[in-house]
Amino acid sequence: WLVALLGMATKYAECLLAVKYRVRDKYGFMAGGPMYYIERGLGIKWLAKLFALFGVLVAFFGIGTFPQVNAITHAMQDTFNVPVVITATVVTVLVAMIILGGVRRIARASAVIVPFMALGYVTTSIIILIVNYDKLPAAISLIIQSAFNPQAALGGAVGFTVMKAIQSGVARGIFSNESGLGSAPIAAAAAQTKEPVRQGLISMTGTFLDTIIVCTMTGLVLVITGAWSNPE
């Protein structure tokens, strides 16, 4: 939750700057992001190029693709016994059809898929929480106790436990909302708006909904159902 609050401020700043320093490319689309406001705002061209290079590498080989596809393929294999190769091929084809259509097709696909995806996920989570409402207090208590386990206080280990809890929370929070990573500003720069401040405010709500609302519900569902202690 703390990461979400700090991330909201970060997301606001980076998306505001993305709209403020964006440019129109030769195809007529708005392009922006950290590499643009680093070059046009700070005037450090070499750093902007370096960010763009590492941004491409991360998008291709890092958190931009591998974790998501890995989660989908293994979920299909574990739940429906669908071979990983088949699921990966289908995902690749579908994603290629959307990406090759450019920014507009990506926006249209996101406008259709994301609302239904989010609504279905949140609705299912709420139903599970309502059905198991009597377990909510114990689940919340377990989450808090697990973060600061008093049994780990032997030999000064409590400091290490707190440190690991913070590291884990920060890593998962940033991975979830992407605040400060530079990916969100690239998308925000393509927004059809002339108000950088407004876009910054809109972008920061995504961090709140994703990390504070959705991640909290996910954690409670995992604890209530016992899935956290029995991944299978």
Predicted regions and their residues:
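Juxtamembrane transmembrane-helix boundary signature
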Residues: 2-31, 92-93, 224
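Membrane-embedded alpha-helical segments of transport systems
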Residues: 2-10, 47, 53-66, 205-217
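Extracellular/periplasmic helix-exit of transmembrane alpha-helices
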Residues: 14-20, 124-142, 150, 154-157, ...
